[in-house]
A protein has these predicted regions:
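Transmembrane alpha-helices and adjacent helix-loop boundaries
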Residues: 2-348
Length: 348
């Protein structure tokens, strides 16, 4: 009897060890594939401008640059809205702050925004920290309304601030490159900002700080009773979120060669960040990236078929509404919950 028991115990131990080994191997495979895919995608996009040697692909570069800007902004918004659970519709303010700060340095002192973008991000983060100290005392609908009020105040201020051009805006000098290569510096800069933002979001999510953010998004009172300084965590998340948006705004301003409040300080810019995260999967790493790609692609499709009017916005909205009926947690979130997420999109 004892021999049988020992044999059974030994067999169980072997089976358990084998199962543990298989799980470790599976996790390692997932991690390898999840690392391989975004790096391969980044390398492919970095090589894309080589197409300019065989033809004019400026529009393709513009689309990638535009998408990369929203990847950066949506991933940045995800730090506050996805991890901490605070939905802000005022993040276009930091897009404008970054654009105007670096744009003014370029217009008056000739310093390229490619150099001053990190500084613009820090200015946006400092303003975000100050704003967060005030607005993050409330949450839910009250916080959303306060973020919209912030955007409205900023729009009035920028429209009437003659030092930065007022409502007429400010024209920025173009670079000295030929038309074929003029987009190249901004293309690589925005690609780098997008990659850095996604990587930072991943690091934040898997840090002690990120764990605290996710805890307070579930139950802020319980998180505070567990010893988490919820006010600091929220304000820090707000500042970090503003930092990356400010950098994207800095590069976008010089790329356009002009700054106007009706371009930067639009609620549509903030809404796009939110919608991209929701469509892709709020709180995930790959979600904002997938959401940005899908919404930009849908918008371009509807503009091409329906023209540049509000109808294309309606079309994009309808597709999103239908999509969320089938993917209530976003594309990445729903597939991950059901265990059907492709390994190449498992970036979490």
């Amino acid at each position: 009897m004892m021999t049988v028991t020992l044999q059974d115990s030994s067999a169980s131990a072997v089976i358990e060890a084998r199962r543990t080994y298989n799980e470790k191997l599976s996790r390692k495979t997932d991690q390898t594939r999840a690392t391989w895919f975004p790096l391969a995608l980044l390398a492919l996009l970095a090589a894309l401008p080589l197409l300019q040697f065989v033809g004019n692909y400026n529009y393709v570069l513009h689309l990638v640059l535009f998408t990369a800007s929203y990847v950066a902004m949506a991933s940045s918004w995800n730090i506050l809205g996805g991890f901490a659970g605070y939905v802000s519709l005022g993040h276009a303010v930091f897009f404008g702050v970054g654009g105007y700060f670096s744009g003014m340095l370029l217009a008056r002192y000739g310093i390229s925004t490619l150099i001053t973008a990190p500084l613009a991000g820090l200015v946006a983060a400092a303003i975000g920290y100050g704003v967060g100290l005030v607005t993050l005392k409330v949450r839910g609908p009250s916080f959303i309304i306060s973020s919209i009020a912030l955007l409205m105040i900023a729009r009035i201020l920028f429209d009437n601030w003659h030092f930065i051009g007022g409502a007429n805006g400010l024209t920025l000098p173009p670079n000295d490159l030929t038309v074929q290569w003029a987009k190249l510096p901004y293309y690589y800069a925005m690609l780098a900002i997008a990659a850095f933002t996604v990587w930072s979001a991943y690091k934040i999510k898997h840090s002690k700080f990120g764990l605290g953010l996710r805890a307070l998004s579930k139950d802020e009172i319980k998180a505070e009773s567990a010893g988490i300084d919820t006010r600091f965590y929220k304000v820090a998340a707000f500042a970090l979120s503003a930092f990356f948006v400010g950098m994207a705004g800095a590069v976008w301003g010089e790329y356009l060669t002009y700054l106007r409040p009706n371009i930067f300080l639009l609620i549509l810019v903030s809404a796009n960040m939110v919608l991209m995260c929701i469509l892709g999967g709020k709180g995930t790493i790959a979600g904002p990236v997938i959401g940005a790609i899908l919404i930009v692609a849908l918008n371009e499709l509807f503009v091409a078929t329906m023209g540049a009017s509000e109808i294309n916005i309606l079309g994009t909205g309808l597709v999103m509404a239908i999509g969320l009926m089938f993917f209530p947690l976003g594309l990445v979130g729903t597939l991950a919950r059901s265990g059907k997420l492709p390994r190449i999109l498992n970036w979490d």
